[in-house]
Amino acid sequence: MELISFFNEVKEAAIAFSGGVDSSFLLYAAKRFECNARAYFVKTQFQPEFELDEAVKFAESLDMPLTVLSYDILAHEEIARNSPERCYYCKSAIMKLIFDAAARDGYSTVLDGTNASDDALDRPGMKAIHELGVRSPLRECGLTKKEIRALLKAAKLSVWNKPAYSCLATRVPFGTSLSETLLSNVEDAENALFDLGFSDFRARVCSDDTALLQFTGDQLSDALDMEERIVSDISPYFRSVRIDRTAREKRP
């Protein structure tokens, strides 16, 4: 199936929108193929503020309606305790929230940006979207992440080369409880790295007061050259800060 055929079938839909590459392309495709669609962004403690800002700007650039739903994800004990099933519980809670909001707006179909490159074994959240009946047109149409980036580039949309960015909870090892303070410290630490000019990195939590900073190969040497400045800028958020000498793998 091609996307034009999908949207010939699905004339109106709610779109779970994160502002990332995949859901941005899905929103663009809905606009291009004249689907009566509305984007829904769920703001929890897991999403940094810049992601909301970028999502709002992108939706506005397409002149597509966007609803922002605020949600206390840490109110769910099974999520806050950060078990290996956290992603499943989180995705389930967020999608149920979107379904409820979409229904109030008259939408019965919810779409998300899962693509053909996503590995179901590595993404517990895919189980939740399957259970809830969310449709994933990019995956149904066989579009890979590489193809999606190429199509966004061809459409001259700057999001085409946006680095992959997972939620703040992924910085914390399973079994370490999640709190607003800990997640806020991670966000502030990563904002400090953005301010220093870095764009593809992770501030991993080793303990409540220790962070391990990981950079992709093209940025690691610069980070090591600036190590003293980096440690100084992040020390307000973590007592101990280290830079991983091994480059992190760049995600597609």
Spans of features found by a protein language model:
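A short interface-forming secondary-structure element
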Residues: 207-225
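Short, low-order "capping/linker" segments at domain edges
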Residues: 249-252
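Short, structured loop/turn "capping" segments at alpha-beta junctions
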Residues: 144-145, 149-150, 157-166, 199-200
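Short amphipathic alpha-helix segments
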Residues: 180-201
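Internal, active-site/partner-interface "lid" segment
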Residues: 162-182
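C-terminal boundary motif of the adenylate-forming
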Residues: 197-206, 244
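Alpha-helix N-cap and loop-to-helix initiation/capping positions
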Residues: 86, 178-181, 222-226
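ATP-dependent adenylation/nucleotidyltransferase module used to activate substrates
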Residues: 1-154, 195, 211, 228-238, ...
